[in-house]
Every structure is written in C-alpha cells, then in structure tokens.
Amino acid sequence: MKIRNSLKSLRGRHRDNQLVRRKGRVYVINKTQKRYKARQG
C-alpha cells in the first residue's frame, strides 16, 4: 500500500479506483486491480 499526501492523482490512474473514508483516514481501493491501494498520510 502506498502512502501519499494527495490521492486525487492516484485515483485517476485506473477507472475502477474508489475513494473511501474509513476511521478518519482516506483510502483509494480497487477491487479488480489490488495493486492500486493507497492511504493518505
């Protein structure tokens, strides 16, 4: 999982990416391509 300051550019890398908020953190998840996971930090 990548940890980045800005997730907007990472979300645009694949069309199945989703921006999700869990427990006060922001994540990018992708159910078809698991390698696109990222967390904001």
From Swiss-Prot:
Coiled coil: none annotated. GO terms for molecular function: structural constituent of ribosome. Keywords: Ribonucleoprotein, Ribosomal protein. GO terms for cellular component: ribonucleoprotein complex; ribosome. InterPro entries: Ribosomal_bL36, Ribosomal_bL36_sp, Ribosomal_L36_bact. Residues 1-21 are annotated as: Disordered. GO terms for biological process: translation. Belongs to the bacterial ribosomal protein bL36 family. This is Large ribosomal subunit protein bL36. It comes from Methylobacterium sp. (strain 4-46). The lineage of its organism: Bacteria, Pseudomonadati, Pseudomonadota, Alphaproteobacteria, Hyphomicrobiales. The gene is rpmJ.
